[in-house]
């Protein structure tokens, strides 16, 4: 019988390189927020991949970037702490974008913070480009990371090469116990996941100014008194300015209703029951730069 292996794996890369989508594809359920806005992942969410002879715990981090606000600095510190504690780091570089200074900076950061941690290259989004572009990108990544680096091309969307990536990750993990019971997919509390799902719905299709300015706090979750099959969820969406409040709510509240419907469907999937979702929007001026507000909003 093969020895059971287990350990922690962290995907890193510029914002929007497919890290969260990859986490969700490997786990087989949505545990990380995915959005085509950079810097949308804020909490270290652990997705858990179970098989008979191994367990991979995926640590999801915000994309590393040069910080402009106190929130940005805190997010970067969180990423760096994570780097030094995991068994394997997978650096994600999309097949459809040339390697740039941002990728080189991140590679240097990883090597500075965690020089001894196993690092593999992951070329993501290979379904978006022809095979020769994938081959060229593999070569470019190998030039960045050195000739000995293991590099795996994958598509989280189509599932191509996911099994190959899983095998490569497992081969680098130490023998160890299962840290989580079988069937558990994440150790994030449900309220954190609910807040993330609402945030994801609110970010969908809005202008670039909003992502970093939006925080979601779950105010209350309760069972409806007269019904066993209904849970009431009350949440507050915090923005920094009046103009942003208008963007979130939309004309006559239309956009907020859309957000509510999309988020409710996802939360019902998460909880496995019907949900009544009540959303309110409030202003917390410049919360990203204010340590007190950051603390209150969970950062």
Curated annotation (Swiss-Prot):
Residues 124-127 are annotated as: G4. The gene is era. Its main location: other. This is GTPase Era. GO terms for cellular component: cell envelope; cytosol; extracellular region. InterPro entries: G_ERA_dom, GTP-bd, GTPase_Era-like, KH_dom-like_a/b, KH_dom_type_2, KH_sf_prok-type, P-loop_NTPase, Small_GTP-bd. Residues 154-156 are annotated as: G5. Residues 39-43 are annotated as: G2. Residues 5-175 form the Era-type G domain.
